[in-house]
């Protein structure tokens, strides 16, 4: 038995350690726990009635909206709750960056693992409504996995189809993994084009993911090579893990405090991320590519 883990849990439940200058920014973790629990509860209820078969998935979502009592409320609460999860997560990460929480590697990396699991869960949720935007978003994202042949073929290959839908539905337990990780969903898309039945022969003018994936989507649009785009996207997440090692980089710490970089880093990240969200939802144009490239260089 791991007595250290038990004592650590008891210490947090009975005598929670917190700084003297505690303020409202320390509420984000608690709010995330509440929203996450509500998401799991609604996700389980919606999973009871949705049919993950190619011919019925879209119509089962419409059945939830129109035929089931208060089904529309559960569906839209689930979609809105997913946005709240990512809003609170991004604010939580920014708070950690501002207060140099990366100096606590165990807590920092544990939180980033929850963030990555949430991203994977939201991606699986793209497929479930099986609307027009769901289908084409999934086609774009799964094609990025062509470097990993086994995963690529398991996701349905170049043609997203019924096996893809069923295999992704199997991974709806991912929120429970994130919940366990946070202790020691499955979301429908809200884009208007997703309320259209899938048409394999009509590619949308502009494939738009949910807003919390738009910075990554802007990165993929900026870099023409799929492999390079995927590597840069992974690097943008990996760099957060590397922040846990900055305690050993004394030169970087001296630079931050000598030139006041700490005070300007978080506002800069907020501004760059906001601009990348805006660029990600725009039609692909040369000007947007240039600005996106500049913003990503500054962000890195």
Swiss-Prot record:
GO-annotated cellular components: mitochondrial inner membrane
Bilayer topology term: Multi-pass membrane protein
Keywords assigned by UniProt, alphabetized: Electron transport, Heme, Iron, Membrane, Metal-binding, Mitochondrion, Mitochondrion inner membrane, Respiratory chain, Transmembrane, Transmembrane helix, Transport
Binding site for heme b b562: 78
Subcellular location per the Swiss-Prot or TrEMBL entry: Mitochondrion inner membrane
GO molecular function annotation: metal ion binding; ubiquinol-cytochrome-c reductase activity
Cofactor(s) annotated in UniProt: heme b
Pfam family, one: Cytochrome_B
Binding site for heme b b566: 92
Quaternary structure and partners: The main subunits of complex b-c1 are: cytochrome b, cytochrome c1 and the Rieske protein.
Function: Component of the ubiquinol-cytochrome c reductase complex (complex III or cytochrome b-c1 complex) that is part of the mitochondrial respiratory chain. The b-c1 complex mediates electron transfer from ubiquinol to cytochrome c. Contributes to the generation of a proton gradient across the mitochondrial membrane that is then used for ATP synthesis.
Note: Heme 1 (or BL or b562) is low-potential and absorbs at about 562 nm, and heme 2 (or BH or b566) is high-potential and absorbs at about 566 nm.
Family to which this protein belongs: Belongs to the cytochrome b family.
PANTHER family with a match to the protein in the record: CYTOCHROME B
Stated name of the protein: Cytochrome b
């Amino acid at each position: 038995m791991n007595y250290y883990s038990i004592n650590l849990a008891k210490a947090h439940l009975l005598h929670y350690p917190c700084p003297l200058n505690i303020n409202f920014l320390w509420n984000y973790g608690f709010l995330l726990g509440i929203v996450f629990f509500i998401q799991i509860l609604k996700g389980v209820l919606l999973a009871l009635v949705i049919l993950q078969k190619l011919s019925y998935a879209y119509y089962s979502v419409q059945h939830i909206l129109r035929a089931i009592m208060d089904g529309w409320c559960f569906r839209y609460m689930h979609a809105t709750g997913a946005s709240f999860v990512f809003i609170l997560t991004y604010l939580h990460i920014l708070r950690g960056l501002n207060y140099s929480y990366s100096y606590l590697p165990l807590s920092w990396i544990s939180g980033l693992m929850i963030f990555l699991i949430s991203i994977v869960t939201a991606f699986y949720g793209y497929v479930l409504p099986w609307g027009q935007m769901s289908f084409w978003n999934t086609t774009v994202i799964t094609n990025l996995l062509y470097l990993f042949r086994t995963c690529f073929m398991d996701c349905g290959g170049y043609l997203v189809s019924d096996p893809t839908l069923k295999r992704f539905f199997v991974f709806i337990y991912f929120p429970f993994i994130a919940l366990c990780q946070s202790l020691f969903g499955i979301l429908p898309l809200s884009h208007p084009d997703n309320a259209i039945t899938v048409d394999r022969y009509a590619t949308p003018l502009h494939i738009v993911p949910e807003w919390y994936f738009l910075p990554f989507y802007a990165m993929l649009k900026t870099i023409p090579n799929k492999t390079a785009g995927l590597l840069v996207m992974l690097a943008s997440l990996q760099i957060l893990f590397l922040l846990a090692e900055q305690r050993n980089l004394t030169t970087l710490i001296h630079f931050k405090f000598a030139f006041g970089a700490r005070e300007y880093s978080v506002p800069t990240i907020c501004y760059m991320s906001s601009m990348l969200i805006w660029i990600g939802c725009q039609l692909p144009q040369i000007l947007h590519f240039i600005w996106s490239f500049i913003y990503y260089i500054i962000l890195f």
